[in-house]
Amino acid sequence: LPIFQGIRLTHQPSPWIGDYSWLLLTPVTGEISGDTLFYRQSSYNFERAIFNPHYLRIFSERYQIETQLSPTCYGASIQLRQIQGKNLSLYVHAADDLTLEQVDHRTIDIRQSGLTETNKSPLAMFTALTFSVEILSIKQEGQDWRIDLAGAEAQVQLATSFISKEQALLNLPKQDFEDTQTNAKASWEDLLGHFDVVETGPVDRTFFDHCLYRLFLFPQTFYEVNEQGESSHMDLASGTIKPGLLFTNNGFWD
């Protein structure tokens, strides 16, 4: 069976080139015998999993946890369900140094900072997590963090920001999981529907959509909108926040 190590928030357009500001979230239950990713991973049944641009569903055989995810522009909405009624826990893992701060009984701020291939100074990313159930405890294990939750089912709202922790909280999804999934599906259908394909065989449309999906998969929106509706962005050349829009791309020729 294939291995499931968690949901990875990534900025890597291809395995051939490096990643930056990545974060791995691994849902588990109970005590873990070691403090590395090897001890947290689980097998899953590929035939029962769903991998769509707007929706992911995967079932962890080891922990009997169903994980569902739908993306947003700055994050995602996640549904976790432990089918035996055991309390959920969530591990947070990254290559960068992580700092966690509990904002209230259901909200966590994460800050990570690390060097990239092009930046002269470390790039900081802020992540906000809100849970539909209360947080029982937070503890550091090695360089990682474990979040214990008071329930076997939880909806997790996630958002990131390269500006501030306050902006990350503002970027959190405002809708429930079902509405987030509906909006994500509509967004992808709009992007993939920009072109008409004259098909000469059954695989033409599928292959074209696959290539177009990969083109749009890399995050290109690098600006964020504050409470006043004003756009700003992290200027990577100076390491300062500047007003206005900024778009990126991966610059990858393959």
Please identify what each model-predicted range represents.
Residues L1-D254:
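Accessory carbohydrate-recognition regions in carbohydrate-active enzymes
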